[in-house]
Each structure stands twice: as C-alpha cells, then as structure tokens.
Amino acid sequence: MQIDNTVLEKLEKLSHLRIDDSKKEEVMGQLSEILGYIDNLNELNTDHLDAAFSTLKGGTPLREDIPRTENNIARDILSRAPESKDDFFIVPAIIE
C-alpha cells in the first residue's frame, strides 16, 4: 500500500492529529517504511509454529487471578482529577 496525501489526510482525521505541511513528505515516507516492514512480516512462514508459541523456556509463568482493591490508590488518583464524584471521573460530554 502506498501512502499518498489522500491516505495521510484520512489518517489525520481518524487520529485527530494535524501534521504540519513541511513534515507530510517525511511522515508519508516513514509510514511507507512501516508498511513495508509489515509486508515482510506477512511473508514469514509461521505454519510450523503453535499459536501459543513462547520464547520463554517452559512457557509463560501463570499467576493466580485474585482480584484485589487498594482503596488508597483509587483515592489518590481521583484526588488528582480536576473533577470527580462518587469514585468516578467527571469529564466533558463528547457525544450529543
């Protein structure tokens, strides 16, 4: 896939970013390199690999799934919020 101005404008809109006109050529080149790298990865034959393949000897260690709450952490985080109520952040509405 070739990155052109049309694709870059669509990416800007989707990401809510604005790329300065002086940087657009550079960004298009970088994105093209990234897509080229992904194309190389897509060409790799991974048929012989198990879907759960791990590079760690013995696999990934499991841990017990025990929920825990530390109320001081939540209180500490909420204390830094501009506005909160009943253990929730209050944010501006984004959908009308």
From Swiss-Prot:
The keyword Metal-binding does not apply. The keyword Nucleotide-binding applies. Keywords: ATP-binding, Ligase, Nucleotide-binding, Protein biosynthesis. Its EC number is 6.3.5.-. GO terms for biological process: glutaminyl-tRNAGln biosynthesis via transamidation; regulation of translational fidelity; translation. Disulfide bonds: none annotated. It comes from the Bacteria. GO terms for molecular function: asparaginyl-tRNA synthase (glutamine-hydrolyzing) activity; ATP binding; glutaminyl-tRNA synthase (glutamine-hydrolyzing) activity. Belongs to the GatC family. Heterotrimer of A, B and C subunits. Allows the formation of correctly charged Asn-tRNA(Asn) or Gln-tRNA(Gln) through the transamidation of misacylated Asp-tRNA(Asn) or Glu-tRNA(Gln) in organisms which lack either or both of asparaginyl-tRNA or glutaminyl-tRNA synthetases. The reaction takes place in the presence of glutamine and ATP through an activated phospho-Asp-tRNA(Asn) or phospho-Glu-tRNA(Gln). This is Aspartyl/glutamyl-tRNA(Asn/Gln) amidotransferase subunit C. The lineage of its organism: Bacteria, Pseudomonadati, Campylobacterota, Epsilonproteobacteria, Campylobacterales.
